[in-house]
Amino acid sequence: MKRHNVNKAPAIRAVTSFIMASALFLSSSFGASVAHAETKTVSYEHNESVDGKISDFKKMVAEGKDLSDKLVIISTNDVHGAIQKYPYVASLKNFFKNELNADVLLVDSGDFSQDKNPEHNNEDADSASCMEPSEGLAGVEAMNAAGYDIATLGNHEFESFVKLDKNLSKAKFKVICSNLVTKDARTELETAEKNNKNDNNALMNTFNSLTEKDYFCAPCYTYNSSKTGIKVGFFGLLTGEANINNISAKKLKDSLALSCAKYQINSLGDNGADIIICLSHLGLEDDRGDHQNRSIDIYNAVKNDPTYKANYPLDLVLDGHSHTLISSGGNGEPIMSGKYMLQYAGITIIGKDTDGKAKIEKSVLVSLDDMKENLGPDEEANATITNIINSYNPSFFGGTPEKTSKEKKSNRSHSDSKRRKSNWARLRWNRKRRSSRSRRAAVIRWRTWRNAEARTRRRSGTKS
């Protein structure tokens, strides 16, 4: 079990970063480091075992075994623009689907719209640097190509350059987030919280009065596996550090996060979910201010706290945000996260016990290196994603970078301006030239007339 300092870049620090960078504007490198990376402390004890081995699953295939009665969930988090690695995740999904005959879901816990690069104190970051040129769209396009089924939102989906509404309209996967609501819904919930401090049931009733229109996107999603008969309910939670600046929705106050989780779990359970999973972009960092809203805090509250205890168990938390490698909690809590940049992926296998009750049979992490060595990339996904990268940043593969739409527009404007200036200069020059020609012609005519007059006078003996 380990405790860590981890590097990450919360967008909510943008204002602080700007102030510090302004005060120390002569030291631009300092400002950049503040804006893009911070050292966060994770003192929560957890396990980092990478027990998953592709070779073990290949051995099952060789022995004629399969997972036809299982639901397999492959999970990722905090990809941060490393979309060139998605073909390996697609290959992992297709391996379980085609070779082991399992029903497979591919899910993500957020931060798929922003790049991370080494110059921002992320030494092992290797983004394809397509997010800003594409306004975040490359992340969604690559996830479509990889075959994602469900994702929640991270704080970096709300970067100022990201066109989130436009991008999500092109997503072929479900997007869920339960604590991102309309302004009116947030006011209603905050009022209910204030007026019913000692009555959490009243707050649950207020949550229950909300409809899907009161949320930015669907708060939850239930997958009904027709192949296995297992129903899995998912809900998403967004960190309070998100700086919502590119959409009209509002995130709930941190004090409402526990109640929000409790309501979603109860709602999913009431609607028949056998297994309930939180796609969490909360992380495990220590500094949460007055409200402890780490993923482990949510899990412990809905399990043990009399106020927030849910009617059904929270079976698994697939976490993101703090870039932590975690296979399980220090006390066996079912929390899993694959660090970041697709360095690891989670594999969760759900089956049924002898009584026919759904249960999680195994949750393990596998490394990207293992996927590369034993599976290789999915060819179709690789071709599509290579084209996506070439569209926005061909220099990644050694080509000439294509200009962004803003650069193209700027260049067009500059070119138009130069052309207009050139045309105006040419017009003025032509006018001058025509005027000059006219003057020269007039002088020539006058000289011709004068010479003719002089010759006439000489012949007649008249002096000029």
Please report, for each region that a protein language model flagged, where it lies by residue.
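Compositionally biased, low-complexity flexible segments
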Residues: R447-N451, R455-K463
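Acidic, metal/ion-coordinating pockets
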Residues: E38-M371
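Compositionally biased, intrinsically disordered low-complexity segments enriched in Pro/Arg/Gln/His
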Residues: R420, R428-R437, R455
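Tryptophan (W) side chains
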Residues: W424, W429, W446-W449
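Sec-dependent signal peptide cleavage junction
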Residues: F25-S43
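A short C-terminal boundary segment appended to hydrolase-like catalytic domains
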Residues: K352-R412, D416-K418, R426, K432, ...
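Bacterial Sec-dependent N-terminal signal peptides
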Residues: M1-F18
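Bacterial N-terminal signal peptides
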Residues: T16-S28
